[in-house]
Amino acid sequence: MSKLGALLTICLLLFPITALLMDGDQPADRPAERMDYDISSEVHRLLERRHPPCCMYGRCRRYPGCSSASCCQGG
């Protein structure tokens, strides 16, 4: 029975030490790796600001993103 108790004690002492993250493994300590997951508007295409389309419902509208009134041609 004492062998089982000793084995259980050793297992309980060793497992939490290996299961916890060490300070060096924290994402805050690795800025280069954090940049891979950056979802700022400069990187993520779904967050980009887009101009409204020039041609809506068959009419050509003037928006700051449109260069001329002929923006609907070819569409």
Swiss-Prot record:
<dbReference type="GO" id="GO:0035792">
    <property type="term" value="C:host cell postsynaptic membrane"/>
</dbReference>
<keyword id="KW-1015">Disulfide bond</keyword>
<keyword id="KW-0379">Hydroxylation</keyword>
<keyword id="KW-0027">Amidation</keyword>
<feature type="disulfide bond">
    <location>
        <begin position="60"/>
        <end position="72"/>
    </location>
</feature>
<keyword id="KW-0732">Signal</keyword>
<dbReference type="GO" id="GO:0005576">
    <property type="term" value="C:extracellular region"/>
</dbReference>
<comment type="function">
    <text>Psi-conotoxins act on postsynaptic membranes, and act as non-competitive antagonist of nicotinic acetylcholine receptors (nAChR). Is more toxic than Psi-conotoxin PIIIF. In vivo, has paralytic activity when injected intraperitoneally into goldfish.</text>
</comment>
<keyword id="KW-0629">Postsynaptic neurotoxin</keyword>
<feature type="modified residue" description="Glycine amide">
    <location>
        <position position="74"/>
    </location>
</feature>
<protein>
    <recommendedName>
        <fullName>Psi-conotoxin PIIIE</fullName>
    </recommendedName>
</protein>
<dbReference type="GO" id="GO:0008200">
    <property type="term" value="F:ion channel inhibitor activity"/>
</dbReference>
<feature type="modified residue" description="4-hydroxyproline">
    <location>
        <position position="64"/>
    </location>
</feature>
<feature type="disulfide bond">
    <location>
        <begin position="54"/>
        <end position="66"/>
    </location>
</feature>
<dbReference type="GO" id="GO:0090729">
    <property type="term" value="F:toxin activity"/>
</dbReference>
<keyword id="KW-0165">Cleavage on pair of basic residues</keyword>
<comment type="similarity">
    <text>Belongs to the conotoxin M superfamily.</text>
</comment>
<keyword id="KW-0964">Secreted</keyword>
<keyword id="KW-0008">Acetylcholine receptor inhibiting toxin</keyword>
<keyword id="KW-0800">Toxin</keyword>
<feature type="modified residue" description="4-hydroxyproline">
    <location>
        <position position="52"/>
    </location>
</feature>
<dbReference type="InterPro" id="IPR004214">
    <property type="entry name" value="Conotoxin"/>
</dbReference>
<dbReference type="Pfam" id="PF02950">
    <property type="entry name" value="Conotoxin"/>
</dbReference>
<dbReference type="GO" id="GO:0030550">
    <property type="term" value="F:acetylcholine receptor inhibitor activity"/>
</dbReference>
<feature type="propeptide">
    <location>
        <begin position="20"/>
        <end position="50"/>
    </location>
</feature>
<keyword id="KW-0872">Ion channel impairing toxin</keyword>
<feature type="disulfide bond">
    <location>
        <begin position="55"/>
        <end position="71"/>
    </location>
</feature>
<keyword id="KW-0528">Neurotoxin</keyword>
<feature type="modified residue" description="4-hydroxyproline">
    <location>
        <position position="53"/>
    </location>
</feature>
<feature type="signal peptide">
    <location>
        <begin position="1"/>
        <end position="19"/>
    </location>
</feature>
